[in-house]
């Protein structure tokens, strides 16, 4: 058996040199892999989130997004452009039964208008496998397929045991950041929203909002028989125009969305338990008012007005109080 004790681990000095800013380095523009409405949504060494309530239409948008990698044109303004020498794309489906999984593959074919998908598309159904096993399979696949530039993980909650555990959520986000950097890939993942507050689920949701390059918000309008996808958070570009799809006898078609405007959220709509959890996460030490407001915006991907409203609620309910230095702390 190979002696792994001889593997060299970089010293702190070596790590500092490796991580140091390189003034002559210019990022390759080809690193941008996913654009929606012409806006930069996903680039290599990043991960993005397709979010929404269960049965809100996430799979339809994601399937059409995947299909855009196989055709020279965009689909519903979404376009995946794979690097010339790394044209492999892979889907790990952690949720679907056999029936839904194979229907999903057929859906991707229909969106791409192809009878057969190219051999540089790989897909795995891992519904019956455990969290650790799925992660190891992902890592092994990436080791064996260095020409893979896009990895789709549907869904993220199956890669974690307790999505409300701070340590476990932190470890998962670190794992995502590590494999995207080491393997130079874009990860496209799916995360459910809570029905109570329309936020990404649990602590892992807070972490994903904070570290993802983009978080997309998908909603279903039963009254109008439409689905709407908008940008909740965009790190690398401005928001794209919402994409509205209407179901015409089982066929999704894009329709004009001039009348579709994202509704502004109110901090008062946030569930009390969720508000308390968020407060404890953010105000872990005495902080200035402006620091807390900035952190709320970062964690929730909401507006400055929303953050100030939430801070006002925390103060009025006695959840935080000002100390003798003028900083706020948990009461």
Located regions from the model:
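C-terminal regions of RecA-like/P-loop NTPase motor modules
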Residues: 3-12, 26, 144-147, 221-331
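Conserved catalytic network of the ASCE P-loop NTPase/AAA+ motor domain
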Residues: 42, 81-84, 143-145, 178-183, ...
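The Walker A/P-loop phosphate-binding site
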Residues: 2-108
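Short, solvent-exposed loop/turn segments at secondary-structure junctions
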Residues: 43, 159-163, 193-200
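Generic structural signal for well-ordered alpha-helices
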Residues: 138-139, 173-176, 311
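Conserved inter-motif catalytic segment of the P-loop NTP-binding fold
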Residues: 53, 83-171
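Phosphate-binding/switch region of NTP-binding enzymes
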Residues: 49-50, 60, 90, 170-254
């Amino acid at each position: 058996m190979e002696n792994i004790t001889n593997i060299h681990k970089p010293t702190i000095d070596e790590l500092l040199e490796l991580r140091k800013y390189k003034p002559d380095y210019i990022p390759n523009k080809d690193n941008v892999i996913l654009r929606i409405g012409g806006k930069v949504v996903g680039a290599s060494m990043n991960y993005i989130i397709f979010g929404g309530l269960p049965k809100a239409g996430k799979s339809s948008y994601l399937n059409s997004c995947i299909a855009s990698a196989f055709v020279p044109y965009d689909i519903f303004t979404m376009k995946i452009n794979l690097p010339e020498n790394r044209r492999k794309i892979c889907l790990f489906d952690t949720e679907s039964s056999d029936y839904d999984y194979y229907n999903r593959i057929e859906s991707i074919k229909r969106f791409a208008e192809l009878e057969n998908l190219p051999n540089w598309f790989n897909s795995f159904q891992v519904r019956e496998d455990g969290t650790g096993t799925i992660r190891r399979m992902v890592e092994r696949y990436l080791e064996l397929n260095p020409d893979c530039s896009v990895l789709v993980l549907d869904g993220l909650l199956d890669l974690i045991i307790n999505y409300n555990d701070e340590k476990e959520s932190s470890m998962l986000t670190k794992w995502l950041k590590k494999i995207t950097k080491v393997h130079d890939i874009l990860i496209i993942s799916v995360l459910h929203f809570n029905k109570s507050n329309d936020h990404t689920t649990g602590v892992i949701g807070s972490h994903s909002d904070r570290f993802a390059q983009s978080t997309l918000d998908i909603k279903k309008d039963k009254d109008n028989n439409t689905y709407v996808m908008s940008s909740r958070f965009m790190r690398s570009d401005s928001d794209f125009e919402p994409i509205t799809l209407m179901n015409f006898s089982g066929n999704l078609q894009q329709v004009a969305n001039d009348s579709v405007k994202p509704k502004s959220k109110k901090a008062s709509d946030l569930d009390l338990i969720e508000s308390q959890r968020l407060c404890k996460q953010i105000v872990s030490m005495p902080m200035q008012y402006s620091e807390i407001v900035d952190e709320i915006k970062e964690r929730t991907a909401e507006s400055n007005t929303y953050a100030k409203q939430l801070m006002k609620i925390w103060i009025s309910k006695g959840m935080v109080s000002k100390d003798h230095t003028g900083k706020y702390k948990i009461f």
